[in-house]
């Protein structure tokens, strides 16, 4: 019973964080909706003012400000300022982490965010998988080019078919989040490929699907032991969310998976997640750590 309550409580925390990420991506929340609506209409000044007001606490606003500065929309274009905002939000906003991983240092005079498309296009057209992936990111985020999901999908597929793990992970997200449940099997297939190549994000998202059966087709039944194995791989690479979930697994024996409870390991994983995770992951890990130290009881909100 304790294990069930622990899992349910953790799921509530994860659901809240997932909802926040989903609403950030889909213009949810009154303030965010107003800012994103203004952005979509080309009213960049209004979007800027709204995002700036909440930027001290809102990572989604920080991401939005970075986009404005990168594209010079409503503000003076500044690659370095865009990068600064994305660095503030990178622990909570996946798009910020992805952009920071592909964009060159603003101090390099040979590159500006506005000209990256024309610099990467020839290599992408010639079949370079990394350039194809980078172009797809530009199109999917709308940095330096108009946001275009159709073009993003084309380049993600080209890179993914060349075993580019990050492109495979992004392509899986595209299938599930853009196309919905009908494409869940395709999403999982791409995540499986990325996971086999060592992509920690793919390992983590696959673990969640196998653990809870979210969107799984009959061809992909629930598999707790597979979920644990995937989280072990992702956690070993320092993935904070995987570390948090794996920690709660180690709080109790899992005989069906030949796993013996190890509260010391659980505590170590949670401490790593708290040190390295974003705001939502840190809160989740802190909640589980409290439960670990208080016989499964979670803190009162």
Where do the model's predicted regions map?
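Hydrophobic face of amphipathic alpha-helices that form TPR/SEL1-like repeat modules
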Residues: 37-38, 53-54, 64-71, 99-106, ...
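Canonical positions in the second alpha-helix
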Residues: 51-54, 88-89, 121-123, 158-159, ...
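Terminal, low-structured helical/coil segments at or just beyond the last alpha-helical repeat
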Residues: 272-301
């Amino acid at each position: 019973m304790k294990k069930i309550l622990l899992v349910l409580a953790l799921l509530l925390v994860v659901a809240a964080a997932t909802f926040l990420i989903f609403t950030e991506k889909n213009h949810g929340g009154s303030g965010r909706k107003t800012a994103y609506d203004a952005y979509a209409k080309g009213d960049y000044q209004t979007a800027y003012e709204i995002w700036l007001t909440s930027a001290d606490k809102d990572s989604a606003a920080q991401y939005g400000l970075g986009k404005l500065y990168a594209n010079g929309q409503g503000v003076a274009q500044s690659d370095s300022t865009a990068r600064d905002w994305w660095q503030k939000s990178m622990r909570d906003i996946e798009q910020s982490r992805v952009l920071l991983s592909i964009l060159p240092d603003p101090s390099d005079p040979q590159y500006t965010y506005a000209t990256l498309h024309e610099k990467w296009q020839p290599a992408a057209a010639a079949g370079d998988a990394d350039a194809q992936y980078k172009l797809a990111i530009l199109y999917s985020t709308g940095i330096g080019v108009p946001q275009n999901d159709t073009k993003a999908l084309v380049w993600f597929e080209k890179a993914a078919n060349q075993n580019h793990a990050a492109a495979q992970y992004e392509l899986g997200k595209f299938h599930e989040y853009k196309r919905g449940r009908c494409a869940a099997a395709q999403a999982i297939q791409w995540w499986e490929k990325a996971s086999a190549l060592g992509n920690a994000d793919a390992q983590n998202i696959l673990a969640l699907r196998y653990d809870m059966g979210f969107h799984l087709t009959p061809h992909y039944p629930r598999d707790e032991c597979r979920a644990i194995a995937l989280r072990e791989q992702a956690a070993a690479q320092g993935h904070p969310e995987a570390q948090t979930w794996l920690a709660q697994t180690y709080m109790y024996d899992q005989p069906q998976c030949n796993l013996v409870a190890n509260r010391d390991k659980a505590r170590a994983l949670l401490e790593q997640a708290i040190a390295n995770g974003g705001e939502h992951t840190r809160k989740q890990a802190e909640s589980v750590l409290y439960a670990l130290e208080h016989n499964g009881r979670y803190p009162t909100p």
